[in-house]
From Swiss-Prot:
Disulfide cross-links: C101-C193
Gene Ontology biological process terms from the UniProt entry: tRNA wobble position uridine thiolation
Assigned protein family: Belongs to the MnmA/TRMU family.
Identification of the protein by name: tRNA-specific 2-thiouridylase MnmA
Length: 367
């Protein structure tokens, strides 16, 4: 089998490529260049897809004895990931750029080019498993990345391989060391790779500009002003510009964001509890959408808690009734549906959260 190994320069993708070589496949390593401008991606131990990472990936490919190339996806990454991220925040949403990158870059643009060049499979270092075409959680639940892969279609999964999903992270590092790979102890990447400073608010402010508005309480009383809704997210407590706590002496939290009027609503922490979710642009990883209500568990953050629920597709929208409340759910987040399974929870599908309702009348209008 002809395999394209997506090599980020980290330990996970390096071991994934090595395992595909061990399996006897014809393997070619590719590193995705996501920026041509210096300083626009995190470097070294704090990011991925930088020039240093490309060099690390090349050295691993040399050890493995496989061809290695760098493919330029900078413009598409800027358009489909960075610009989408900025636009989403301008709408008062809270997106996950890693989900978007997997959907539009790694398993759309990269996979499409690979298939066009005659490759059968794209292998990555994601912690997830495929069984009979079904996407499942990784053995290492602490590192499980099935959440950020739940946006993939059945067609995309047919050309995917996750060689390390059945192995705990600590064993992956040990294996890399045994293989003599210099990246064995390379730290994991964290945060958002295209925000070198780590200051998301400043990054967004430079691109969106000042759009002044107000912060109000549940009664509509103006408590503060702000320079843009992009500086807020649902559940935020600090940096609100408010002098003190609420009338009950408890801290205030962002409970809703109205980008049209540039109004940020704050309230009690209990106002953040939601029990129904609405999702747009649903994707079902097994291919066919469910024909009726389906029992599942729902996850709305990459490593967040799961809650039992019933989900149903009505028209183009996914409606989810939670059996227990989730706290601090924002529009733009990805909701992922799982089917509980002792062999590894199976991903049923995903959607982008378009709305949510809370336990009280009026709920959480900004979620």
């Amino acid at each position: 089998m002809k395999v394209l190994a997506a090599m980020s320069g980290g330990v996970d993708s390096s071991v994934a490529a090595a395992r595909m070589v061990d399996a006897g496949h014809e393997v070619v390593g590719v590193h995705m260049a996501l920026s041509t401008a210096p300083g626009t991606l995190r470097t070294g131990s704090r990011g991925c897809c930088s020039k240093e990472d490309a060099a690390d990936a090349r050295r691993v490919a040399d050890v493995l004895g496989i061809p290695f190339y760098v493919w330029d996806f900078a413009e598409k990454f800027k358009e489909d990931v960075i610009n989408d991220f900025v636009s989403s925040y301008a709408r008062g949403e809270t997106p996950n750029p890693c989900v978007r990158c997997n959907q539009q870059i790694k398993f759309a643009a990269l996979s499409a080019r690979a298939v066009a060049l005659g490759f059968d499979t794209v292998a990555t270092g994601h912690y997830a498993r495929l069984s009979g075409g079904r996407l499942r959680r990784a053995v290492d639940r602490d590192k499980d990345q099935s959440y950020v892969l739940a946006v993939l279609t059945a067609q995309q999964l047919r050309h995917a391989a996750f060689p390390i999903g059945d192995t705990p992270k600590r064993q992956i590092r040990a294996e890399a060391a045994r293989r003599g790979l210099a990246v064995a102890n390379k730290p994991d990447s964290h945060d958002i790779c295209f925000i070198p400073s780590g200051n998301t608010k400043a990054f967004l402010g430079e691109r969106i500009g000042v759009r002044r508005g107000v912060v109000v309480d549940a009664d509509g009383v103006v408590l503060a002003s702000h320079d843009g809704v992009h500086g807020f997210t649902i559940g935020q407590r600090r940096g609100l510009g408010i002098a003190g706590p609420g009338p009950n002496g408890r801290p205030r939290y962002v409970t809703a964001i109205d980008a049209d009027t540039a109004t940020v609503h704050v309230g009690d922490v209990t106002d953040l509890d939601v029990q129904t979710l609405t999702g747009r642009a649903p994707v079902f990883t097994a291919g066919a959408a469910p024909s009726g209500p389906v029992d599942c568990v729902v996850q709305v953050r990459a490593h967040g808690e799961t809650v039992s629920a019933v989900a149903e597709l009505i028209g183009d929208a996914l409606f989810v009734q939670l059996h227990a409340p989730l706290r601090g759910v924002a529009r733009g987040q990805t909701l992922v549906l799982y089917r509980p399974d002792p062999a590894g929870d199976e991903v049923l599908g995903s959607a982008t959260i378009a709305g949510a309702s809370g336990l009280s009348t009026g709920g959480n209008p900004g979620a």
